[in-house]
């Protein structure tokens, strides 16, 4: 799983929304992931978050189509990863990270993955993963 890439909802939205400010970088990063043949995944938390985000920003047809045919494997979060996520929140009380953010951090750590495709600055704040998408 070390080569695997977690796709965050911010990257999914940027890739699908041609009007998104990060669309060009999202397309380039997605091409890079494919060219490198990196396995990709979302968590069940990201799947739910991305669907809600797409529904709000792009409408029900696109949200439904992505949910039913998104093509990314969905990795189910384990109870111990949920507990680790809560511990991360508890030890970083000065951050405004969402539960979905810290679930992603916990899953990346526990599964040995080192890369996230995201435009969410919270991943950089946590500082433990290689980030595709965000500018330095």
Predicted features and spans:
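Short beta-strand and adjacent tight-turn residues that come in two discontinuous sequence segments
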Residues: 118
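PIN-domain endoribonuclease scaffold, especially VapC-family toxins
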Residues: 1-5, 24-96, 106, 110-114, ...
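Conserved glycosyltransferase catalytic-site signature
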Residues: 9, 101-102
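Short, ordered loop/turn segments at secondary-structure junctions
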Residues: 121
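Catalytic P-loop NTPase motifs of RecA-like helicase/translocase cores
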Residues: 13, 125-126
């Amino acid at each position: 799983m070390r080569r695997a890439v977690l796709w965050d909802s911010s990257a999914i939205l940027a890739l699908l929304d041609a009007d998104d400010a990060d669309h060009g970088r999202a397309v380039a990063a997605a091409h890079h992931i494919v060219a490198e043949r990196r396995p990709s995944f979302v968590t069940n938390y990201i799947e739910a978050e991305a669907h809600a985000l797409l529904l709000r920003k792009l409408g029900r047809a696109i949200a439904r189509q992505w949910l039913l045919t998104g093509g990314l494997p969905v990795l189910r979060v384990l109870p111990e990863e949920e507990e680790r996520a809560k511990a991360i929140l508890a030890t970083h009380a000065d951050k405004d990270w969402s539960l979905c953010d810290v679930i992603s951090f916990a899953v990346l750590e526990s599964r040995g993955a080192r890369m996230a495709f995201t435009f969410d600055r919270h991943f950089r704040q946590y500082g433990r993963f290689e980030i595709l998408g965000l500018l330095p």
